[in-house]
């Protein structure tokens, strides 16, 4: 699947608002890919498809997860808000001809993260959180940080997401906690956490 095909596909699957968000995420992902030397076309494709299953019903998502347990990554046992990313990756793999494992990984983990995230995984996760229409408190600080230090930005973003989920009284996806701990455990990550905290994130 090329970028034109992906754009046409999601245009037919998403509401105007969600489609606009998708294009904004694509722009941000490409911008970050340029900064960090990631393949821009890969970043663009992952961004275009990341929410392609966002507006299908939970029942449809459940059917997809059950139909492809080998790709479901924990499936129904994980909180429902993360299902759409996993389902989008499954559809991309099984129905839309996407074979690039890096792209599929980024799509699948863009909501919760996971241990061992690749550079592309991190770029899409951050692009989704900081696309131009996002206006949550602290987003401008994260936009600045992500252009300077990808891992410090990921720590800040994961902490922000996890704190928000817990504040809403909702279950935290174990993958999110594991992703945070994994990045923190890498060499030099204590310094990154201090950097994120010093910037108010």
Question: What residues fall within each predicted segment?
Answer:
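Divalent metal-dependent catalytic cores for phosphoryl transfer on phosphate-bearing substrates
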Residues: 7-12, 30, 35-158
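N-terminal glycine-rich anion-binding loops that anchor highly charged ligand groups
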Residues: 21
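Charged phosphate-binding loop/patch that engages nucleotide di/tri-phosphates or the phosphate backbone
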Residues: 163-201
